[in-house]
Amino acid sequence: MWDALDTSDKHLAMAWALAPDLSPTSAFSHVTAALIHGWPLIGPAPARIHVVDWKLVGVEHRVGLIRHGIDPAGLCLGPSRFDGVPVVDALGTAVAVARTCDPAVAAVAIDHAVRMKAIDRKVFEEHLPPPASRGGRRARLVATALDPAHESPGESYFSIRLVQLGVTNIHPQHEFITNGFRDRVDFWLPDAGVVVEFDGKQKYVDREMLAGRDPSEVLWQEKRREDRIRTHREVRSVIRVTWWHLESLDRFRALLRSHGVLITP
């Protein structure tokens, strides 16, 4: 049973197991709180549970547990509890994740919260620490990539990767109108004249997305759609990006450069 769980489920199971032994001044926080809130996590979940404790000064590392000291005046708890233990609210969780996690991991998780309206992007930005503080620059980089128009973790992942490469003029869910057809693309990069589509396998195998159509018919319609988009004079190229491209920043950079997207060193 345990081996069948993914790392996120194992992390939550460990949090549940540790809950009875936590002090009454503790609350689940950071990535642990993000998983409790139901936010997606790319890559493996951490091996240790995160909590804040308003009676602790500094950070304490234990086997399977990291305790973060926090000023109780700055602690906001959400309405939910996990096995009786309070959980830091969505906004506080987002700020902690943005400061401490890899930018791609943080952006995918927090963008989901923005998309689900669990947090407001502007309010999130207002609560970020100064750039010179620990994790401040990282958190602001993450904030730049957030957009409620992103429709999936893949699009969130793509957006933060672009930001990490210095591409900032990004238009998600842009529409091209051709002879009465309204074609919406995942991303439009007007400075480069490049359309980017996140090319996941799901659209060809998911029954709901297929809507009774044969996968070959969906593929044919995608080709016709792309042909219409390419008729626009401002469109120089159409890039299809997969999860594999995004997993390596160097690989993604090479793909963009091959299509004429200017990436500064």
Model-identified regions with their sequence ranges:
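Short gly/ser-rich loop at a beta-strand->alpha-helix junction or flexible surface loop bordering the NTP-binding
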Residues: 1-135, 171, 264-265
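Surface segments flanking catalytic/ligand-binding clefts of nucleic-acid enzymes
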Residues: 114-265
